[in-house]
Amino acid sequence: MEKRRMQYENTHDPLTGLYQYKQFKRLAGENVRKMSAGEVCGIVMLDLDSFKSINDTFGHNGGDKYLREFASVMKSMPSEYFLTARRSGDEFCMMIFGCKKKEEIIYWLDLFYKVLEDRKILLSETYSQKISASGGLAWTGDNEESIYELLSHADEALYEVKRESKGHYTEYQ
């Protein structure tokens, strides 16, 4: 029991219960290597919108509550298609896998954003706020790509969308 608890603590973020980024990279890399011909997967880097102002206004307790609520949306996605992790601070990542077409990845990512859009969090007795995140999407293509290339491409797409607007995702070009 103790060994299992320690293993969990070494691989999961203590605040959100999501995988730590290091574990995510390991598991996502395994998923990419195991993919069969004709399969595609997507890597999504996510950054919470307006998190700094929430943390400044409602303190660390409010910020932590916001992070946990966002993580609960990530955890609500079907695990046979989603691998989720907290990268650091207000940055998260997920892998959408087990898909035959890019359109399936888009379907699952759009579903995630729909669930997120419908989620509000009560930050004080009189104030609730929708949870919002910007995302960058990269997917496996015709070229053999490593998990590190996919993460880098998803990061580039994230920075692109953050420059333009908030609350949605864009694909790596």
Label each region the model flagged.
Residues D56, K102, I106-Y107, S124-T126, ...:
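Catalytic-core segments of nucleotide cyclases and related cyclic-nucleotide turnover enzymes
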Residues M1-Q7:
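Juxtamembrane or sensor-core-proximal signal-transducing alpha helices
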Residues R86-R87, L116-A133, K162:
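Catalytic core regions of nucleotide second-messenger enzymes
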Residues M95-F97, A138:
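Short hydrophobic/aromatic beta-strand micro-patches
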Residues Q7-H12, Q20-G42, D49-S79, A85-G89, ...:
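Conserved long alpha-helical elements within nucleotide-processing catalytic cores of c-di-GMP signaling
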Residues G42-L46, A85, G136-A138, T170:
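Conserved beta-strand cores of small sensory beta-sandwich domains that regulate signal transduction
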